[in-house]
Amino acid sequence: QLMLNQGTYGGERYLSLETSRLFTQSKSPTCRRGLGFDKPVIGNPKASPCGALAPASVYGHTGFTGTCFWIDPDNQLIYIFLSNRVNPSRANNKLGSLDIRTRIQDAIYKAIDRKSQKDS
């Protein structure tokens, strides 16, 4: 929530706006990462660590055990996926091969889109 609020939480500022932006915006056309967070691969959704329907402003992290979180400031959304990919062994790659995390994220965006179309 702190990052979604650009460094504030509960009415208190913990990170400056400048620091929050450094963490979440890529600084180079050759690297999609901010200082600490991953970003989507623009123009190549198959190579992207997040869903194809996620906006360019999204940032997050994928973990070794299959966990991930993505923060979407455009939609005021935080997507958190908890898992234990290494069970029963480190060779388990079903999360990646089945594209589970990004498919769930895209399902969230499809549901948001359906809701906004219904409300229009």
Language-model regions: role of each:
Residues 1-120:
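Catalytic loop of the DD-peptidase/beta-lactamase superfamily, centered on the K-T-G motif
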